[in-house]
Amino acid sequence: MPQISIFVEYEIHDGRGEEFAALIKDHARRTLFEEDGCLRFEVLKPVEADGAPIPNRMMVSELYADQTAVDLHGSNPRLAIVRAALGPLLKSRKVTRAEVIDEAEDEGLTPDELNASNDG
């Protein structure tokens, strides 16, 4: 089964950005801790080409091991609580799901292969 990537773009009401950021960062941290199938959960701040932050916008990028992991995430009771808390802060939310078609191959040494003979 392919890995599943989820991108969510948020438009936030004026003056609610800090509150939103605190909630979504906590959600990301808890999801990574609670859900083994969540491989990555990044909170992103979109920027212009010159690096200037785009006001009232945030994004998340999530990576799940497979569709089963996505389904488990969707059934996590905490998700409904988080969505209810975020709802009043949002003007809009756009979700894009994608299957990973070219997974990165493991490179380098695995933790089991690390030892003093590799130091040199």
Predicted features and spans:
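An amphipathic, aromatic/His-enriched active-site/gating alpha helix that lines ligand/cofactor pockets
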Residues: H27-C38, L63-R97
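Short, structured helix-loop boundary elements
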Residues: G17, A21, R57, N76-L79
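Short acidic, gly/pro-rich beta-turn/loop elements at beta-sheet edges
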Residues: E18-F20, G51, V70, E105
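N-terminal first-folded block
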Residues: I4-V43
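Short, well-ordered beta-strand segments in beta-rich or mixed alpha/beta enzyme
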Residues: Q3-E11, E42-N76, P111-D112
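Non-catalytic surface loops within mature trypsin-like serine protease
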Residues: I12-D14, D66, E99-D102
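Glycine-rich beta-strand-turn "strand-cap" elements at beta-sheet edges
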Residues: P2, E42-P55, V82-G120
